[in-house]
Amino acid sequence: GKVPVSMGGLGLRAAEDHAPAAYAASVLSAQLQVQDLVGGRQVLDGEEGVLGPEVLGALSVAQGEQEQLRVADLVGMTQRQMSVRVDLHQQRRLMEMVGEGEEREKARLLAVALDHTGDWLNTPPLKALGLHLRSSEFILATKYRLGMPVFDSAGPCPACLHQSDVFGDHAMCCRSGGERISRHNNLRDALFDTAVAAGLGPVKEGRFLLPGNDRRPADVLIRNWVGGKDAALDITVVTPLQDNTMPGAAQTAGHALTYAYERKINGAEEECRRQGIAFLPIVAETFGGWHPDAKREVKKLGAALARHTGQDETEATSHLWSRMSILLQRGNAAILGNRIPNQPGAHIDGII
């Protein structure tokens, strides 16, 4: 929680951690103004009287420096830059607290630090635009992000009756029920609607793209999208906390994204290429990280929308990321909320 959203936390920084950075930045900024006023003497040439050893020592500790900082190390830095160093130290400490055998926690911490995992937390809750989560959805999504127990106890999964854990790992892998399909369809529709609004004339779930079968490699087909070729965007969501990906995800951020991307490529890329179609897997992790190719395509869609509507490109792309992030976490919450483990009821036999 003490690390910013961009590093996998909730952005609830501790004032005691960042106070030295705020004070040092303020003093140094004021000294620069004094220097401009008085001229001549360079008040920041020396360290004495500018920042005391107590301040420099506290800031050094907050940033995790092995040797005490000097004023010369800080001149020209903004408070934001100093605070980022504090945040990075907090992130390192968090990783160091994880034991050697805690593979799941390592994988989670790496996953939540990927780009865009916290977009839903930074999105204003605008109900009119569908950019909001209900309280129950927000609680489930937050617990899952922080690695807290999502359920009160383990027990049989109500969807498939297999044993479920308290953290929601089984729930995210459970193939029974329609929540995973609904999550996929909502993400697909967001990309499709954006392509429509951008005037790209997309086709949803286009049939008979490949000769000899009715496979649908394109959740969204966009004409003339890649070097004059039609592009088949195929959306999938993968959890890094499954048996197939957890060991790699505990070592490398985005391992599950690569795993799912390669599976998609091996499944349809060659057949699409033969038909002159560019096959583009759009892969996301349950925590909200996206494969580099997916990020490129979402950014490209945002740019196309901005050109067609006259919006600012950065703003249009940011709104698209917000929408995708909210939809992903809403889908996760539906999966978790419908898989609260069953517990056997109390057996009353009348015997005292």
What are these regions (language model features)?
Residues N185-G199:
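Inter-domain linker/hinge segments that demarcate the starts of reverse transcriptase
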Residues L10, A14-D17, A24, C157-L187:
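Short Cys/His-based metal-binding microdomains
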Residues A30-Q66, D193:
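Charge-dense polyanion-binding interfaces
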